[in-house]
Amino acid sequence: MKLLIHSAQESPIVPLENNNINVIHKDNLDIDQIPNYLYNEIECYDYLEYTEDETLDKLLAKISSKGTLKLKGVDIYQASRNFADGNLTTVDMSKAIANGKRRCFSVHELSEIISSKNCSIVFAGISGLNYMIEAQKND
């Protein structure tokens, strides 16, 4: 089974025939109510930035052995670089890094944190302002 957590107003488009994907808005998710090891894949779009510090550990606990965690969010260094270069207005920068978020990440720091939690980084990269990380649990 797969869990897809998003923060957008509209849900992502998921194939209708694939009923093994649970799509949940970040505001409707109670991570503590999900049994551990339930999902073989969890995908998060702009989710970690809105959460408490221990949420990454809780997400990893919900993934089965050798399962996958995919994360996407705004990379603070990319946003800062684009702002400093004049490619982002103050309003756009505020939307990218603030907008109700509790914290910011960079692809490098988040990759190191995930690696320290018994996971292998399969992919880590940047596209525009966004980081993308795919990790696999080693247990």
What are the functions of these language-model segments?
Residues 53-68:
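A short glycine-rich, Lys/Arg-flanked "PGG" loop and its adjoining helix->strand segment in the class I
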Residues 66-78:
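Conserved beta-strand signature within the Rossmann-like core of class I S-adenosyl-L-methionine
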Residues 82-100:
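Short, glycine-/aromatic-enriched active-site segment of Class I SAM-dependent methyltransferases
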Residues 1-34:
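Class I SAM-dependent methyltransferase SAM/SAH-binding core
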Residues 29-45:
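A short acidic, Gly/Pro-enriched loop at the edge of an enzyme's catalytic core
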Residues 47-48, 73:
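Hydrophobic adenine-recognition pocket in adenosine-nucleotide-binding enzymes
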Residues 2, 117-139:
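Core SAM-dependent methyltransferase catalytic element
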Residues 98-118:
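Short alpha-helix
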